[in-house]
Amino acid sequence: MVDKQPFVWVQVDGEEKLATVNLVPGNQVYNEKLVQMNGSEYRVWNPFRSKLAAAIMNGLEDFPFTEKSDILYLGVSTGTTISHISDIIGQSGIIFGIEHASRVARDFLDRVASHRKNIVPIIHAVSYTHLTLPTILLV
């Protein structure tokens, strides 16, 4: 069943699961289940790995992102939530995703940003605190 929201509910093993239309069909970010339905591929959005998914499942009233949104996302970690937001905003939107921890930043670059053209990764080294965000964006 498709809602008017930018996400959908899909049936998986007899249960309703939150999902987004996969912007990169065939690509998984965190080993999430892929579901084929109505000619589209959906990625199940795990609320135990994403606070935004948990908020939606608990009745979030004002969902802030739509197709074509422009977003600055601080602390992308390994990319679970940002990947689903990427699905939602589509090719017409853009996300500037910032991460400072080098290990998780590598995972984010390998698993997410390298596959999604609507994500601009910004890896901010905290050891360079004299650089501000505008400086980083201009480099």
Task: Explain the meaning of each model-derived region.
Residues 1-30:
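N-terminal auxiliary segments of SAM/dcSAM-dependent transferases
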Residues 47-67:
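Conserved alpha-helix/loop element of class I SAM-dependent methyltransferases that forms part
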Residues 68-77:
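Conserved class I S-adenosyl-L-methionine
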Residues 78-90:
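Conserved SAM-binding loop of SAM-dependent methyltransferases across substrates and taxa
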Residues 94-99:
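Conserved SAM-binding motif I beta-strand of class I
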Residues 105-106:
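Short alpha-helix immediately C-terminal to the canonical SAM-binding loop
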Residues 117-125:
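Conserved SAM-binding strand-loop segment of SAM-dependent methyltransferases
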Residues 129-135:
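Conserved small/polar residues in nucleotide/adenosyl-binding loops
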